């Protein structure tokens, strides 16, 4: 069964998210405006796109690997819930040491649609033990 995501363009600069390759998991998100992002700064990039994500799904905003590798760009965590109807904004982080220019129509991030479960939270006094126990960061090897 196919999933449908309804899209609204808020301006002529908006571009409907799309996959660049048939095997791509993420749908590219595009800037609707031009920006200059100073080194070690973050901005909210507007896409001028609103989405209606199906129930029991959400959209996860993720970085584009080429921007990360080549320009030290990161994207702030973003979860787009199925009941959100506002504009999709991207927290764009320049970790590089020079200005980064974004032009109208530049691909800046991607959205990956994932199914979600809604478990019932149950308070208990203790948890069953496992081999790992409460060993945290790095405990399973580097």
From Swiss-Prot:
The keyword Lyase does not apply. Pfam families: dUTPase (PF00692). It is an enzyme of class 3 (hydrolase). Belongs to the dUTPase family. This is Deoxyuridine 5'-triphosphate nucleotidohydrolase. This enzyme is involved in nucleotide metabolism: it produces dUMP, the immediate precursor of thymidine nucleotides and it decreases the intracellular concentration of dUTP so that uracil cannot be incorporated into DNA. PANTHER family: DEOXYURIDINE 5'-TRIPHOSPHATE NUCLEOTIDOHYDROLASE. InterPro entries: dUTPase, dUTPase-like, dUTPase-like_sf, dUTPase_trimeric.
């Amino acid at each position: 069964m196919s999933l449908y995501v309804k899209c609204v363009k808020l301006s002529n600069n908006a571009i409907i998210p799309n996959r660049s390759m048939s095997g791509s998991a993420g749908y590219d998100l595009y800037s609707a405006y031009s920006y200059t992002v100073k080194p070690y700064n973050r901005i909210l990039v507007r896409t001028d796109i609103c989405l209606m994500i199906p129930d029991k799904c959400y959209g996860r905003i993720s970085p584009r690997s080429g921007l990360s590798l080549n320009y030290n760009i990161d994207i702030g965590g973003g979860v787009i819930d199925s009941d959100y109807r506002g504009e999709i904004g991207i927290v764009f982080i320049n970790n590089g040491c020079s200005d980064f220019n974004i032009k109208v129509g530049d691909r800046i991030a991607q959205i990956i649609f994932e199914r979600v479960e809604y478990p019932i939270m149950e308070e208990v006094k203790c948890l069953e033990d496992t081999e790992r126990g409460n060993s945290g960061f790095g405990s399973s090897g580097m």
